Amino acid sequence: MMERSVFLGLDIGSTTAKLALVAADGKLLEAQYLRHGAAVRQTLSTMLDQLALKYPGMAVSAAITGSASLGLSETLGLPFVQEVVAASRAIAVLAPQTDVAVELGGEDAKILYLSQGMDLRMNEACAGGTGAFIDQMAALLHTDASGLNELAANYTTLYPIASRCGVFAKTDVVPLLNEGAAREDLAASIFQAVVEQTIGGLACGNPIRGKVAFLGGPLHFLPELRKRFIATLKLAPEEVVPFPNAQYMVALGTALSLVDLPGAARMADMEPVTLGTLAERAPASDAEDRRPPSLRCSTTKPTTICSANATTGTPPRASRWNPRPARSSSADLGSTTVKAVLADADGAVLTS
């Protein structure tokens, strides 16, 4: 068995991919943060290729987390770590003085209460007040998230803006734009809307006090957003926990969940794997990843509308060695009705 000395944490979220390479003593060796633009597997493959080239032959113990990583966990042969577990592990190791952690991601927001037992608050049904919401509002002002931050630094007035939904927010922002409101004021107001959505929608009256850490990409890269949180919560400078690698925090926690640090439990022993092997396992594109089983029509039982022949991946093209099926079927399972169609090789409907 190879020596356990280096640990890799992967965090594949809804809009970004992060990785953290950590030594046995908890020291961060390498970190990456990339927007994947929905090309999840291609981005991950590129990141792992670059890491394998930089550290040839390096063996690591690895784990993965994130909202877009469940299928990749199986593809890469890596254990899946819950985001909350990874986040709390990173905080416990790197900032144990933290009482409350506020984290914003691409499409989720979390508040972790840590000082009196673990209590997690997380948005459930809407991405309002998250990184995706900020991107959408930035586009409305013809800029990006960084541009929104630069504008907000020079604001003079805050306007009330809805943040539960991007559609509702637009109904507030567009009239203000038409009335001549300054873009700087609108940018700061959008950040304030994110703050109010997070505090009002997640804290639900539970006070955010003590030592507070601000985590996740939006709160790391947008200091004006962080300032709006600090001002709204009336935090003194000594109450804000410094977290220099806040954008990698969950990836760090995923790696640290594998590290055998004093006084902290870790995951069960795993056989290390080389970075090159991980890079080879990663599909170069989404098309190469496994697809759900398809439903195929039985040619031996023509009276049966559909039989579930579980075939993983895209059905092969017709050829002389793999003739086109004589019949094919599809089903539409709606909320109140079920529809099914049986068609021949030319697409003509046989029955429905």
Task: Report the location of each language-model feature.
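Short beta-strand-loop/turn "lid" adjacent to the catalytic site in phosphate-handling enzymes
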Residues: 26, 30-36, 51-85, 112-121
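Phosphate/ATP-binding catalytic cores across multiple sugar-kinase/actin-like superfamilies
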Residues: 189-208, 254, 308-317
